[in-house]
Amino acid sequence: MSCTTVPELGGLMDRGGTSGRRIVVSLKSQQATLYHQGKVVAVAPISSGREGKDTPVGRYSVIQKSPDHRSSIYGNYVRNGKVVKENVDNRKTPRPAGSKFEGVPMPYFLRFTGAYGLHAGNVPGYPASSGCVRLPKRHAKRFYDAVRIGTPVVVQR
C-alpha cells in the first residue's frame, strides 16, 4: 500500500491550526488516514501493537510533536560507542556497568496519549510494534508536517 494524497488538497495541509484535520487509525486494516474538512488527504500503511502490546483504542489528540524523538523505554545499552546489549526494555533489563541507555529512534513522533504515538518505523504489513503506530518514514513526515498540537486522533479496531 502506498501513501496517497489528494493533489487539490495538498496545500491545505500546510496551514496552521487544527481546524478540520484529524487522523483515523484502523487497527483492522492496518492503515492511517489523514482527513481535512472531512476529505481524505492521505492514506498510509501502518504497523500497530503486536499481541500483548496492543495499541490503545479510543479518541485522543496530538499532545506532543518531536521530529527526532527517541524512546525512553526501548533501545540499546552502549559503552564507548559500542552496543553491549541490544533491543532492551530498560524497565526489565539491568544496565551493564559502564554503559548508558540509548533509545531507539522514533522520527516524526506524534504523541497522542501516555507512551503512545505515531512515528516512522518498520512496517512489515502486520501488527509488530510495542504499542505505537509505525508508518513508513516518508508517510510519517507527511502526517507530521500536516498536523498541529490538538489535532484529533481516533484509534479504532
Label the predicted regions.
Residues Y60-S72:
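Short, solvent-exposed cationic patches
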Residues K28-Q30, Q37-V40, G49-E51, K65-D68, ...:
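Solvent-exposed coil/turn segments that connect beta secondary-structure elements
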Residues V40-V43, I149:
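Short amphipathic alpha-helical segments with coiled-coil-like heptad repeat character
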Residues L9-R22, L27, A42-G52, V57-Y60, ...:
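N-terminal post-signal-peptidase region of extra-cytosolic proteins
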Residues R22-S26, Q31-Y35, P45, S61-I63, ...:
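Soluble periplasmic/extracytoplasmic beta-strand elements of cell-envelope proteins
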Residues M1-S2:
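C-terminal motif of bacterial Sec signal peptides marking the signal peptidase cleavage site
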Residues T5, G16-T18, V57, N76-R157:
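Exported/periplasmic cell-wall-interacting domains
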Residues H36, A44-P45, K53-T55, I73, ...:
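A short, polar/proline- and glycine-enriched secondary-structure boundary/capping micro-motif
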